[in-house]
């Protein structure tokens, strides 16, 4: 036993392993599962202590792309750019989104767009239905024929239906209507235009470069100074002498002999025929027609001409007094008249210039016998306007053809209406509306007359086509 070596205790290796001089052993490594994907470690760049990194949720919209659907480019807080597709969310016009939803969606990446309605876009379908509904009632009430009723589509060129409705209403409600130098056909034509304009205004239909009434409000300025008249250019008209020869049997010749015996005489012309020679010392013409002969106009003329300047100014004063009597509280009607610009042959929507005048011819007519009436015996103010100023303005076809005279090469019609009857047509249409439509009378806006080169007198007609179904012309 004495020669056997001494055995060391078994706890010594353990104490040696756990001594503070050596670090503790690492735990055994576990094997990774094959189905587990470990993302690659991204080393963030070292930042300066003075730089505070932004949150990844912070973003800034750089710009929007106008594609369909729309996109927007945003920049994240970490500097990366992202293209985001905008999703269309329709929000009703009357529904206001709550503030809570806006706060909740402000931090999300989903963009919200509102559907904004363009106020300039007119709902044509609903306007057409509204106008057709009213016209169906009027056509049924005033006995429009079934063929015309079926063909009516509420189009601008279908003014004949409005004219027939007005004619039937006049026969039933205003029988025996008195007119002054106005034909019944022209009066109902103008009433039909005013009615069509009111129906279109009621329905909400608007036209571009076209006025349904064919009229304008003209600030003539012919009553400001005594003896001074102004043409459609707005310039002062020139006074010159005029000698006219007309046939004895014509309408103009007989009227001249009856109304102006001191200025007319019957002579024989160079062909030996008896004619009525009329000499006017107070004729007025446009400044562009000073060098032109009788019944001749330059290519820059407005076509306005008066054989007697004094009679024309009396007619303008009559219309001014007539409007003052009918509308005593008017604010903007002084020295303005309602002028029909387009007769039947000019009332075309293509607006192609015709040969001759491009506006209705304006002629002053004398009211024979009006000067014999006493103002003390008449109490009606509108009638007193004609007694004090016994002349009226008459609007005729742009290129009229008189009886027993040679026809002109341009288009013509029998359009003829006086200035007071133009106002009467507008007044009767307003009465018609109040009697037949429950809705209030819409506000009719008649444009103000402004001179344009399109209204110049045309001595040469533009070439026009007549249509052809063939593909090749030759």
UniProtKB/Swiss-Prot annotation:
Signal peptide segment: none
Domain of life: Viruses
Binding residues for Zn(2+) 1: 231, 233, 286, 302
Gene Ontology molecular function, alphabetical: DNA binding; zinc ion binding
Swiss-Prot/TrEMBL GO biological process terms: DNA replication; DNA-templated transcription; positive regulation of DNA replication; viral DNA genome replication; viral DNA strand displacement replication
Phosphotyrosine PTM positions: 142
Start and end residues of each stretch annotated as C-terminal arm, DBP binding: 460-474
Function field: Plays a role in the elongation phase of viral strand displacement replication by unwinding the template in an ATP-independent fashion, employing its capacity to form multimers. Also enhances the rate of initiation. Released from template upon second strand synthesis. Assembles in complex with viral pTP, viral pol, host NFIA and host POU2F1/OCT1 on viral origin of replication. Covers the whole ssDNA genome during synthesis. The complementary strand synthesis induces its relese from DNA template. May inhibit cellular transcription mediated by the interaction between host SRCAP and CBP.
The protein's assembly and partners: Homomultimerizes on viral ssDNA bound to pTP. Forms a initiation complex with viral polymerase, pTP and hosts NFIA and POU2F1/OCT1. Interacts with host SRCAP.
Domain characteristics, as noted in the entry: The C-terminal arm bridges DBP molecules together, thereby creating a chain.
Similarity comment: Belongs to the adenoviridae E2A DNA-binding protein family.
UniProt protein name: DNA-binding protein
Lineage of the organism: Viruses, Varidnaviria, Bamfordvirae, Preplasmiviricota, Tectiliviricetes
Gene: DBP
